[in-house]
Amino acid sequence: MTIILKPGSVPLETLEKIYREGLPVRIDPAFHAGIEKAAARIAEIAAGDAPVYGINTGFGKLASIRIAAGDVATLQRNLILSHCCGVGEPLSENIVRLIMALKLVSLGRGASGVRLEVITLIEAMLEKGVIPMIPEKGSVGASGDLAPLAHMTAAMIGEGEAFYRGERLSGAKALGKAGLKPVVLAAKEGLALINGTQTSTALALAGLFRAHRAVRTALITGALSTDAAMGSDAPFHEEIHQLRGHKGQIDAGRALRTLLEGSAIRRSHLEGDQRVQDPYCIRCQPQVDGACLDILRQAARTLEIEANAVTDNPLVLSDGRAVSGGNFHAEPVAFAADQIALAVCEIGAISQRRIALLVDPSLSFGLPAFLTRKPGLNSGLMIAEVTSAALMSENKQMAHPASVDSTPTSANQEDHVSMACHGARRLLQMTANLNAIIGIEALTGALGVELRKPLTTSAELAKVIAALRAKVVTLEEDRYMADDLKAAAELVADGTLSGVISAGILPDLEA
């Protein structure tokens, strides 16, 4: 299956499919004429006498240097090779595929001036599985993601490195094995390929998709913890949340209420329970997870716009002029990444407090210490809770905003930058930590519910426990725990736990 992209209107759902499934993509042929028109205009400018930035001049601080017509192709090649300054481990294939798809969307708007053969090469590389090797570090998020995108482009011109069928090869070899030929870049094409926010945006989108799946699963594990602790569902009453009015809170409250419907555990303590109120980590789940959901939705709107944007420079306007601007500055992406980081941090923080509640016999309303029937002889989930605390603390440190930092670069020509790329990249580690925290809560919540037998939980939550137990058997005696934690985190990350819940209960990213 090939996804047909309509530049300017590619929805989040399609972007997530590209990220998760690695499907090949193509630009809708209806956009080809506009692409070729802009390319023809760039060719006209390159053949003329007037200096135009990036077409017949140097770059950055060197923009005042005029380039001879005979050197234009060399200029573009030199630009790519000199900008391949990335360091660190290679970005994963699914991230690079998304970067390439986003670059297609941007170029496909017909304002960048690249020839159609550049577009078709990217499409063919995605179809045949030639994935450029892009180091993870080196971008400050303005002027675009220069170093990462230069590594992408290097493979296109037969330089650099690329992955093909599991092998890490030179760019030329990877293209050759796939039956493809490198492109010779024409005027402005190198600049159009590297000057954009696609790396930052792809990383931020990946973080967004992972965070959304995590918050949906956190609502499930939060409901499990509520039932395990014999908490009240009264704070999830719809009118409470309607009176405040925040959409995320309303949706989170509804999800929690629905997940707990029919629980025999809940019915067992409707009367005679001397506790007046539950701790905040139980009672305030709609307010906290709902606020996180709202901020993820806000970030989603920003990133959907950015994913469809033209972010290189200069741009070919509708009147045929090539005009320099600053769309390459990734400040919107940096802000969105910071928002996502805050949400990820808070989802994990309140989940960790519920884990701590369930393993503490002074708070768990009758559950044994550390959820083991033989405390002392067995330690149960004691250190799993400690691990969740370590991960929570790590995420708090990483949640510091990246966008508030800036440093002058390129001899002060590029004197304010967004730091969007590493602000977005850290989301991968933060969401991995979050998945592990929520996975631990799944273990504590499920075990807590099982320890309430013969009382049973709701039908929806019973499905979640069954999905968990298919991979992680109930903890009866102490055993090697690392495999349990890994399996539980994977069930969060791959959507298994959220996938068993009936449609319409868990909140969507687009509200």
UniProtKB/Swiss-Prot annotation:
Subcellular compartments: Cytoplasm
Molecular-function annotations in GO: histidine ammonia-lyase activity
InterPro entries recorded: Aromatic_Lyase (IPR001106), Fumarase/histidase_N (IPR024083), HutH (IPR005921), L-Aspartase-like (IPR008948), Phe/His_NH3-lyase_AS (IPR022313)
The keyword DNA-binding is annotated on this UniProt entry: no
PTM note: Contains an active site 4-methylidene-imidazol-5-one (MIO), which is formed autocatalytically by cyclization and dehydration of residues Ala-Ser-Gly.
Cross-link (5-imidazolinone (Ala-Gly)): 142-144
UniProt-listed Gene3D superfamilies: Fumarase/aspartase (Central domain), Fumarase/aspartase (N-terminal domain)
Highest rank taxon of the organism: Bacteria
Residue numbers bearing the 2,3-didehydroalanine (Ser) modification: 143
Alphabetical list of PANTHER family matching this protein: HISTIDINE AMMONIA-LYASE
Sequence similarity: Belongs to the PAL/histidase family.
Name of this protein: Histidine ammonia-lyase
Gene: hutH
